């Protein structure tokens, strides 16, 4: 094992130290959260060395040390894949987690179970690292389920609240639907290729049937909150803000996209799956952007923007650009985590007020938080030379020069424009104008944990895109020539979005709508999707179950067997008897018919 892989394993295994220490030393320790935060910072610094070595040499490594078990001809072993995707993602995830852990020291300082909270976050990080570095489906599935169960525990952290419990249950149920697809794909690979190792699967048959790939797409739909299985992500905002910043913006929700990137060698020549992926991503990115326009909860707006960006990543995979989707995963993590932390800072300072209509004028009261929020929003919209620009602008350019589904690409452009609209709406409502919160609210953002954590991500939101895109060579040949109007498309639609948002804000200030329009209702009620899916099927199920339980037993078994069947039998026999008229000619006729039929049959038989 060379130095490169040793250092990478050291940076990952150091994360398990706080878990081990908590098992050995069970009594409460007030310094434990600080200990966890420091360990993650050390892991991040250590992971930078192998990443730099990888960027310099470009040498991928597979570590396969521990053989676990053999089932007939299937060999299961612990295998780590240190390639382009895992080597770049690990430092990004560790950096973001380090900042969020420090933010949690401020945000959760009054929580009596802060030690357990940090343990949960650390366990989540370990399972995420298992998922990213896995070289076989079995190991990947362990990480996949691990992040799912940690998401459930962390969303329902404040278990005294009904909403938190409902949201946690909703998240796990929607993810279960996705997991069915994952398990189906695993079973297919086991029966047809007799292996779960990624290299062997890719080598054996690149032209698979659509079934396992559809299973993987369903798994990605569940985990990455794509249209159809998307309602759990906005509901997950019931959890604490650090959970939203870490799990539901930058790391866990991109696991579905990461899965599709991992299996891209099987998808790149499959037109059906590519088209399905593209259309699914386009519908998601537009639908969730529309839903974000009229929400009033600051965290829900950012959650819908996350879902919209995930849709954009899926679109990028759909136009056969997995490396570009991965670049967007890495750049998106910085500013989206920072946006959540800024919203958490505002919520905490305003005594847990999340409604943007009850904020306002915070630019003077919270200069650092609001500046970071504005820069994060600009990075999200793809402002030139901020982090988001380096991936988002490339995605729009590649989409414009792609010859695939034009409708899907048009929907993506509209969604990009709407990104600017809801980002500007947050800035207008929360930061500008007159203060609309209680005058006795004491606002204080002068805490080193808060300032340092946001500051690090702020630097990342400005410079990370430049560094990542400069140090990583392009893997596909870029377009050599492009008309100037196509080059400026992304910037144009963003500016259009800003203009539209300014116009809307002026209308909102000067005009009161007595009756909301149908479009407003559609957006505000999330496209009626939760109303339909969470009300009608359960109602039909419950009423059918009640009827089958209460009526089936009584009506069929008890009534039909004895009382009803006896009466039916008596009625039929009485009808039969009463129709007999007692005339001899009728009896003779019946004899004659029988005789004729028997003679005919006898003749035919001969």
Swiss-Prot record:
One of its GO terms (cellular component) is mitochondrial inner membrane. Belongs to the complex I subunit 5 family. Pfam families: NADH5_C, Proton_antipo_M, Proton_antipo_N. Core subunit of respiratory chain NADH dehydrogenase (Complex I) which is composed of 45 different subunits. It catalyses: a ubiquinone + NADH + 5 H(+)(in) = a ubiquinol + NAD(+) + 4 H(+)(out). InterPro entries: NADH_DH_su5_C, NADHpl_OxRdtase_5_subgr, ND/Mrp_TM, NU5C-like, Proton_antipo_N. It comes from Equus asinus. The gene is MT-ND5. It is found in: Mitochondrion inner membrane. Its main location: mitochondrion. It comes from the Eukaryota. The chain crosses the membrane at residues 4-24, 38-58, 87-107, 117-137, 140-160, 171-191, 211-233, 241-261, 273-293, 301-320, 325-347, 366-386, 413-433, 457-477, 488-508, 584-604. This is NADH-ubiquinone oxidoreductase chain 5. The keyword Electron transport applies. Keywords: Electron transport, Membrane, Mitochondrion, Mitochondrion inner membrane, NAD, Respiratory chain, Translocase, Transmembrane, Transmembrane helix, Transport, Ubiquinone. The keyword Zinc does not apply.
């Amino acid at each position: 094992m060379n130095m490169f892989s040793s250092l990478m394993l050291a940076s990952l295994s150091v994360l398990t130290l706080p878990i081990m220490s908590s098992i050995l030393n069970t009594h409460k320790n007030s310094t434990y959260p600080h200990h966890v935060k420091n360990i993650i910072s050390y892991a991040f610094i250590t992971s930078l060395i192998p990443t730099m070595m990888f960027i310099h040499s470009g040498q991928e490594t597979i570590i396969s040390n521990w053989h676990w078990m053999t089932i007939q001809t299937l060999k299961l072993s612990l295998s780590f894949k240190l390639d382009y995707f895992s080597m770049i993602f690990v430092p990004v995830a560790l950096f973001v987690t380090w900042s969020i852990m420090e933010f949690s020291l401020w945000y959760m300082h009054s929580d009596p179970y802060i030690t357990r909270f940090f343990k949960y976050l650390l366990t989540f990080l370990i399972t995420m690292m298992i998922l990213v570095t896995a070289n076989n489906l079995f190991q990947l599935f362990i990480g996949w389920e691990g992040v799912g169960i940690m998401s459930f525990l962390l969303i329902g952290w404040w278990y005294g609240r009904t909403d938190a419990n409902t949201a946690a249950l909703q998240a796990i149920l929607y993810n279960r639907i996705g997991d069915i697809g994952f398990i189906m794909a695993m079973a297919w690979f086991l029966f047809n290729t007799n292996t779960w190792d990624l290299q062997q699967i890719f080598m054996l048959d690149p032209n698979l049937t659509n079934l396992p790939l559809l299973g993987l797409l369903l798994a990605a739909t569940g985990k990455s909150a794509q249209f159809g299985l998307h309602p759990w992500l906005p509901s997950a905002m019931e959890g604490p803000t650090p959970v939203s910043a870490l799990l539901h913006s930058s790391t866990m929700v991109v696991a579905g996209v990461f899965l599709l990137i991992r299996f891209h060698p099987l998808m790149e020549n499959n037109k059906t799956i590519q088209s399905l992926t593209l259309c699914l991503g386009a519908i998601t990115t537009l639908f969730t952007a529309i839903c974000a326009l009229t929400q009033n909860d600051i965290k829900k707006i950012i959650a819908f923007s996350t879902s919209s960006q995930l849709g954009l990543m899926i679109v990028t995979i759909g136009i056969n650009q997995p490396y570009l989707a991965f670049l967007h995963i890495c750049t998106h993590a910085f500013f989206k985590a920072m946006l959540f932390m800024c919203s958490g800072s505002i919520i905490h300072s305003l005594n847990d007020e999340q409604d943007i209509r009850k904020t306002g004028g915070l630019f003077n009261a919270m200069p650092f938080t609001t500046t970071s929020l504005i820069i994060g929003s600009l990075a999200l919209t793809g402002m030139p030379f901020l982090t988001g620009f380096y991936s988002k602008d490339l995605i729009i350019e590649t989409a414009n020069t792609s010859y695939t589904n034009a409708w899907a690409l048009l929907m993506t452009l509209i969604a990009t424009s709407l990104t600017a609209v809801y980002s500007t709406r947050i800035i207008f409502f929360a930061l500008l104008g007159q203060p609309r919160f209680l005058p006795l609210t004491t606002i204080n953002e002068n805490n080193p944990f808060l300032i340092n954590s946001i500051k690090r991500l702020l630097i990342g939101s400005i410079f990370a895109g430049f560094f990542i895109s400069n140090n990583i060579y392009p893997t596909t040949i870029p377009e050599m020539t492009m008309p100037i109007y196509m080059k400026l498309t992304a910037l144009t639609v963003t500016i259009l979005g800003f203009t539209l948002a300014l116009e809307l804000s002026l209308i909102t200030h000067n005009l009161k709508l007595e009756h909301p329009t149908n479009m407003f209702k559609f957006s505000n009620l999330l496209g009626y999707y939760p109303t339909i899916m969470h009300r009608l099927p359960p109602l039909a199920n419950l009423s059918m179950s009640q009827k089958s339980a209460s009526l089936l037993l009584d009506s069929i078994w008890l009534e039909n067997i004895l009382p009803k069947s006896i009466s039916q039998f008596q009625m039929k026999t009485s009808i039969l008897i009463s129709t007999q008229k007692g005339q001899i000619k009728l009896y003779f006729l019946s004899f004659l018919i029988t005789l004729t039929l028997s003679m005919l049959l006898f003749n035919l038989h001969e």
